[in-house]
Amino acid sequence: MVRLASCVLGFCLFTASALFAAAPDQTDKDKFIEAINTARAAVVEALNRAPLGFRRILFVSAIPEGFAAYQPRANNIFAPDEPLIVYTEPVGVAWTKDGDEFSSKLVIDFDIRSPDGKVLAGQKSFGEFALSAREEPLDFMTHIKLDVTGAPAGSYILGLTIHDTKSGKSTTTDLPFEIK
């Protein structure tokens, strides 16, 4: 399926570049808009076919200001009173048409485990992210902030599970971290 989506996207981009090369007048706005819409439709199709997962997920040093507006942490070592802040870019999110808008809803579970897998803390349905838009978004981000104050120094694993309530799909990822 991913190969098909790549072929569709590649064909659309090839078509768009051929359109630009064939048009001697680069200021023809309608042709540019048509090419952009064709490429956008191919990206939406690829995103709709993608399994639920993360394009990007990492610890960041502050609450992100928006999509791709984050500061990655230099490492995964946290002070005892420092919150864990995770930036995510989910992909494969299901969007359903509700009237004039598309909507999605993700529910987050987390657990904190020892390196040997023992669950030390956690919560089901810890966070919920719902989004509505006039068009299916190409880019989507969330962030998660966890207060681990009081946890002793040591190595841990943050397990995050995201449930897509529209599709019924889930995905899990682990982020190792230390408290020093």
What are these regions (language model features)?
Residues 7-18:
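Bacterial N-terminal signal peptides
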Residues 1-5:
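Positively charged n-region of N-terminal signal peptides that target proteins for export
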